[in-house]
Design a protein with these regions (language model features):
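Low-complexity, flexible helical/coil segments
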Residues: 76-79, 86-95, 157-160, 199, ...
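Extended, alpha-helix-rich binding/interface surfaces that flank or overlap catalytic cores
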Residues: 329, 336-338, 343-415
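Extracellular glycoside hydrolase catalytic/binding regions
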Residues: 33-35, 194-344, 349-366
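Bacterial Sec-dependent N-terminal signal peptides
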Residues: 1-27
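Active-site mouth of glycoside hydrolases
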Residues: 30, 37-52, 56-256, 261-270
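Conserved Rossmann-like nucleotide-binding pocket used by diverse enzymes
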Residues: 17, 161-162, 311
Length: 415
């Protein structure tokens, strides 16, 4: 999971602007250079087993409110709208560029490597590969440029990378984490499904010969448990996954494809056919509960029934003692893991960002009623103060200024 790749740039611009990583990848043709599957194990090119350990680069290419300490303003779209209301679209675009340039850098990837990690999971928003408005850009999206950078940094650090479409077209979850409109429209929209397939085909075509990438996670945490037609949606899950696999296999037969369960990656009952592709592994998530084997027995039972690898793509936000105990449980049961997240404000991460001076004024605005133009005007604080606070955040998020959470890192048992 820590070998890298990041994604962004318009689909046309990417093929013209970023040949360097693609040219390197074209030189690698031997399928033996890639991670393979043997039963429930991942096998490295040298024949040894890979047990995934490390973290997620959450918030970087898919902003999430709570990592900024926002509450109501919790999705990428809501965050961007709030910033535009606060300081205008031009300054917001400047902020997003600086954010992407500084939140994750080569130094962060090397730091992650030094913790004993071997794999990084990279969550990204599908809009990074379209002309849609996202993080201050439209037609000039820089997704491929960002992923190319991470791939090179992971190569230098000897890490593997998992590409995770955290926010799919139409929304796959129906909550803030997929930046949707409150429903997983992906499962009912042919246009969204086509775009999802097209983006994965383009990503796979670019990286088809890149062994730093462990695999492609088609989308994150499908189908939240809030909907009265949940079982109907669950019944569509495997078919939507298969469409993505078919699109990828048109151009890439080298990489593993990761499939997550329904309802927070915890329900694997919708899966009826584990043999439709020979490079499939499954991924689960878990926050809270007992750190015991009994607590994840249904996941283990599914893994054993299909005899394919299972990996805990997200876990965290608990005490160091709980994390240490659960890591031991996962090691004993051959379930690799990447903790969520690597970096955010305050603790419960590898490194913490200290809120800059006057950030509380931005928090106040983010939580204030803004359903009318009058409410926006009345809540808006002093421009000079909040613009400085936003730029101070950029400085604060640099690794050199973050607080290393030593106990958290030690609890993961990677060294």
């Amino acid at each position: 999971m820590l070998k890298s790749i990041l994604v962004g740039t318009s689909l046309l611009a990417a093929s013209l602007m970023l040949g360097r990583c693609g040219e390197k990848a074209e030189k690698i043709q031997d399928s033996a250079a890639f991670i393979t599957i043997q039963g429930q194990d991942l096998i490295k090119p040298d024949g040894t087993k890979l047990f995934i350990m490390d973290t997620n680069l959450g918030n970087w290419l898919n902003p999430e409110g709570y990592m900024f300490k926002f509450s109501k303003t919790n999705s990428p779209r809501f965050i961007n709208e709030m910033f535009c209301q606060l300081v205008g679209p031009d300054f917001t675009a400047e902020f997003w560029k600086a954010f992407k340039d500084n939140y994750i850098t080569r130094e962060d990837i090397q730091f992650i490597k030094n913790t004993g990690a071997n794999t990084i999971r990279l969550p990204f928003h599908y809009k990074l590969f379209t002309d849609e408005d996202f993080m201050g850009l439209t037609a000039g999206q820089d997704g491929f440029a960002r992923v190319d950078s991470v791939v090179e940094w992971c190569r230098e650090a000897d890490l593997y990378l998992i590409l995770d479409m955290h926010d799919a077209p139409g929304g796959q979850t129906g909550d803030n984490i997929d930046d949707s409109y409150g429903y997983p429209w992906l499962f009912e929209s042919e246009a969204s499904q086509q775009l999802y397939c097209d983006i994965w085909r383009k990503i796979a075509d670019r990286y088809k010969n890149e062994p730093v990438i462990l695999g492609y996670e088609l989308f994150n945490e499908p189908i939240a448990p809030y909907f009265p037609n949940m079982e109907e949606l669950n019944g569509k899950l495997e078919d939507i996954y298969k469409k993505g696999v078919v699109a990828i296999r048109e151009v890439d037969n080298n990489h593993i494809i990761l499939l997550g369960g329904a309802q927070w990656n915890g329900n694997f009952k919708p899966f009826k056919d584990s043999k439709f592709d020979d490079k499939i592994m499954y991924t689960c998530h878990r926050y809270g509960g007992d750190p015991t084997k009994d607590a994840i027995q249904t996941i283990i039972d599914f893994r054993d029934s299909v005899n394919l690898p299972m990996y805990m793509g997200e876990i965290g936000h608990n005490t160091d003692e709980w994390q240490a105990a659960f890591c031991q449980t996962m090691r004993e049961n051959n379930i690799g893991y990447t903790f969520w997240p690597y970096k955010k404000m305050d603790g419960s991460s590898f490194v913490g960002i200290t809120p800059p001076e006057n950030w509380a004024n931005i928090l106040y605005f983010s939580e204030s009623p803004r359903t009318s133009y009058k409410e926006i005007r009345d809540a808006r604080p002093d421009q000079m103060m909040v613009r400085k606070a936003m730029m101070d955040f950029i400085e604060a998020c640099k690794l050199k200024n973050c607080v290393v959470q030593e106990g958290y890192i030690q609890s993961l048992g990677m060294k």
